[in-house]
Amino acid sequence: MTSQTLLAFDFGTKRIGAAVGQSITCTANILNTIPAKEGIPNWDTIEALLKEWQPDTVIVGLPLNMDGTENELCRRAKKFGNRIHGRFRVPVEMFDERLTTREAKELAWEEGHKGNYANDPVDSIAARLILESWWRQHPPTP
């Protein structure tokens, strides 16, 4: 089996969570949360992550409504994914991320998080969950 490295992003207008993982174990590790202004990150930070991890594919969470319809944040997340692809020529896939932030908050709470998400964000935990969910739907082939 060929090992693949994937980088996942949980897009947000104030913060963008990041996680990296590899296909041999289908697990992911959180990376530092990336500050954003109106959904625009410091592109040098994104570039540094891409250079460090050299992912085969980037997964960007798509924050669909519970009924599966798209919203304004979906449009912005797609724009973010398109910019990554356009700037860095890496394949990008959008992936349904419904309820990952809620699950990330629950996991953080179980580990003692005090609920102050502005000072202690869970966006990168959500990115890890996005990547792990992606692997459950796209298991590697031997």
Curated annotation (Swiss-Prot):
Assigned GO CC terms: cytosol
Record-stated family: Belongs to the YqgF nuclease family.
Family matches, as HAMAP family: Nuclease_YqgF
Entry EC number(s): 3.1.-.-
Function field: Could be a nuclease involved in processing of the 5'-end of pre-16S rRNA.
Biological process according to GO: rRNA 5'-end processing
Keyword Repeat: no
Keywords, sorted A to Z: Cytoplasm, Hydrolase, Nuclease, Ribosome biogenesis
Top-level taxonomy: Bacteria, Pseudomonadati, Pseudomonadota, Gammaproteobacteria, Cellvibrionales
Keyword Iron-sulfur in record: no
Coiled-coil region: none
Subcellular localization: Cytoplasm
Highest taxon listed in the record's lineage: Bacteria
GO molecular-function term, one example from the UniProt record: nuclease activity
Protein name per its UniProtKB record: Putative pre-16S rRNA nuclease
